[in-house]
């Protein structure tokens, strides 16, 4: 907040395309240096996560001269029109809004139960044979950890195969790090866990600690494929957001939040795993996730895998009554995601977990 207050006293708006300013340039340079790929990088800023994914697709299309985009079932990429088309969940993101932009295709995401990495890749090759030639695909977009889709971690084997397929066919690989980026998974970017290098990276949310700022980090030659003025926006990369973004990077380093995320994740997973073993509570899955990006499913029965469809919203409502904010996710609406602030104390984390445990006990008796 101190960084934002100082920037507020200097200036709040110029529009970067009209008059460049230091916070934008400084933040872009720092992100270029931390880009999760080798070679020269460039960064452009926007306002929302949906803008980031839309513009990443625009960059990929400009660089390749192709139109097709492949996304994953269960993925979430925003609420703008193209971002809604990329999103792999019908309700509430698609159904009411009519025809969405075309040349967007979806393949299944591995779920550790019914769909394997091999299944996903088989469907990708089937797509190439049945619906769109790989020579007409501009990009494949994937979340290293699906957010709205249920905190399902993209297997390293899948990411490596996608990278190889993209290299073979000249397709650009987009990592949507809007929810998984900036220390949440124990790395600055979630895809770094796999060692796979994307071509474009979408960023937002924790980038500026909640201030409206998003962006795309990309290989320089791709970013340069767009003509001047082709990307941007009146409020894109606003000075207050950039000042906040610079402070966020400093805090991640100073407070060792990468280590904190890993330690917090271990604490969360250990506690949730203990619930999984108990028969006096609602049946839940084992926890999953990377770092402090952790979730579990509410199940129909103990030792099963079938999710209790739609029950997540009920549990979240109960938690709110007890003073805890939770969010459900997953295609079945039965997944509880835990996104504790990385700056929260262990005592506060335990207090929240105590509330969840109490609800799971009470609902089992209801």
Predicted regions and their residues:
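Conserved N-terminal phosphate-binding loop of PLP-dependent enzymes in the Aspartate aminotransferase
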Residues: 1-366
